[in-house]
């Protein structure tokens, strides 16, 4: 390092490698994170923040929608429906973040981690519950995957999709991990992208049950966590190591089980809501503006 405190490139990378390798021993260093991760919200061009609660598998309830509407009115936020099947509250002042988090927590909602290098969304279609073309319960599987993976830290953001049939309404074939349901089970693809680079997923495996789909997905995410360079999206990592190597590792049942076990050890530390942790004192004080100590001249 060229300075005593390191640099803004190295510190976030080293912080991630340490928390991924030794989750039970290493304490996350908040000062080694990007500003959005430190503040648990995305800073906008005008200095305000966006707040996005998690909606499991794209599902919500009337009570959650009422809470979101109340928060939008209370904090004068713009309301935007996102492509990830969530609702974004835009224009929230930094000093209001703990309060809006507390209000959303009171309605049972947690952080959507829209700012994180970790799991973002699991986009789903309606599946067999409502769609006449659905082959499996894609919504239910998406919710299970999101509840297993949420809170995890990864080298870069991770997005999932679960489509109930090959018509692919959830756009699973351009996600980091995409599951396409078919009559015989589940087709799992990886290393897709829909940003500046557009990539179709590559077929990882076909499985017959939900349990297998969840096992393979979590194992893939953990393998990515352990082997990818910081800030490499899954498609860039797979390009480097090769899909054949990924398949070879994950095809071993013992290795899949070990990867799942290590993932759960990490999740025992990080599967928690940062909004709840920072919505009350003394953490909430960190979001207050600097005091105005201007002194009036003496008479």
Map each language-model feature to its residues:
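Compact, charge-rich alpha-helical regulatory domains located at protein termini
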Residues: 1-15
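Accessory DNA-engaging acidic/polar modules
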Residues: 6, 24, 35-43
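Intrinsically disordered or highly flexible coil/loop and linker segments, enriched in small
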Residues: 23, 27, 77-81, 154-155, ...
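A glycine-rich phosphate-binding loop feature that marks nucleotide/adenosyl-phosphate handling sites
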Residues: 121-122, 159-167, 234-246, 267-268
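Mobile "lid/hinge" segments at catalytic clefts and subdomain interfaces of large enzymes
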Residues: 159, 164, 168, 173-233
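Acidic, Ser/Thr-rich low-complexity intrinsically disordered segments
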Residues: 251-286
């Amino acid at each position: 390092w060229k300075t005593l405190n390191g640099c803004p490139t190295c510190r976030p990378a080293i912080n991630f490698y340490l928390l991924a390798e030794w989750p039970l021993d290493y304490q996350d260093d908040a000062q080694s994170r990007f500003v959005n991760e430190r503040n648990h919200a995305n800073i906008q061009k005008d200095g305000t923040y966006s707040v996005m609660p998690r909606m499991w598998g794209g599902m919500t309830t009337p009570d959650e929608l009422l809470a979101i509407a109340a928060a939008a009115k209370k904090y004068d936020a713009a309301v935007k429906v996102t492509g990830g099947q969530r609702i974004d509250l835009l224009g929230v002042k930094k000093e209001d973040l703990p309060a809006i988090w507390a209000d959303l927590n009171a309605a049972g909602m947690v952080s959507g981690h829209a700012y994180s290098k970790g799991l973002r969304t699991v986009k789903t279609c309606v599946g067999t519950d409502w769609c006449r073309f659905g082959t499996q319960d894609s919504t239910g599987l998406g919710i299970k995957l999101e509840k297993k993976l949420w809170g995890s830290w990864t080298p870069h953001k991770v997005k999932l999709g679960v489509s109930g049939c090959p018509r692919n309404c959830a756009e699973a074939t351009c996600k980091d991990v995409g599951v396409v349901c078919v009559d015989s089970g589940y087709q799992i693809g990886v290393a897709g992208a829909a940003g500046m680079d557009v990539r179709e997923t590559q077929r990882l495996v076909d499985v017959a049950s939900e349990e297998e789909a969840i096992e393979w997905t979590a194992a893939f995410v953990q393998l990515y966590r352990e082997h990818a360079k910081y800030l490499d999206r899954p498609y860039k990592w797979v390009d480097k190591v090769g899909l054949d190597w990924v398949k070879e590792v994950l095809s071993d049942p013992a290795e899949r089980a070990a990867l799942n076990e290590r993932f759960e050890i990490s999740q025992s530390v990080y599967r928690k809501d940062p909004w709840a942790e920072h919505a009350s004192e003394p953490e909430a004080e960190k979001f207050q503006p600097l005091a105005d100590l201007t002194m009036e001249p003496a008479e």
